[in-house]
């Protein structure tokens, strides 16, 4: 079941927090920055992983990191990033990440940001949400919306 919840993603009680990341080692804005500020170990692992893999190797993959009893899933669905309004999310890579997440977290509850891949990454929410519905049917997924806008 997919449920939309208003509030801070990091206050979720789910087993897994999943969010989209770029393949450049930058964890500087959006949910990534909030996670970095909340638990610096997640960022350190992500940055280290980026330093030993090329963006081409990372795109479409998921890096799992456990910290303080929670699993963080970094979904590599952006080869690069920018603040210019362009689309940086690779929707096919995001689907691949979602499929990996479902397979590896089948018996766990999952929280993700509402409009994942769309706010900073520029993807179309209707398209991404349709993929979420398809991939995560029969799963417990929470989509956290920081504000109702």
Residue ranges of predicted features:
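Macrodomain-like recognition of ADP-ribose-binding/processing modules
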Residues: 1-149
């Amino acid at each position: 079941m997919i449920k939309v919840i208003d509030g801070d993603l990091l206050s979720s009680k789910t087993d897994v927090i999943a969010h989209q990341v770029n393949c450049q080692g930058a964890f500087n804005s959006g949910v990534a920055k909030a996670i970095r500020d909340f638990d610096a170990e997640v960022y350190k692992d992500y940055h280290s992983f980026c330093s030993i893999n090329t963006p081409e190797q990372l795109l479409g993959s998921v890096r799992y990191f456990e910290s303080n009893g929670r699993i963080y899933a970094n979904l590599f669905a952006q080869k690069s990033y920018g603040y210019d309004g362009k689309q940086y999310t690779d929707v096919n890579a995001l689907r691949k990440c979602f499929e990996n997440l479902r397979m590896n977290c089948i018996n766990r509850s999952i929280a993700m940001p509402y409009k994942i891949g769309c706010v900073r990454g520029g993807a179309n929410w209707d398209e991404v949400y349709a993929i979420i519905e398809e991939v995560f049917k029969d799963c417990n997924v929470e989509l956290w919306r920081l504000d109702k806008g």
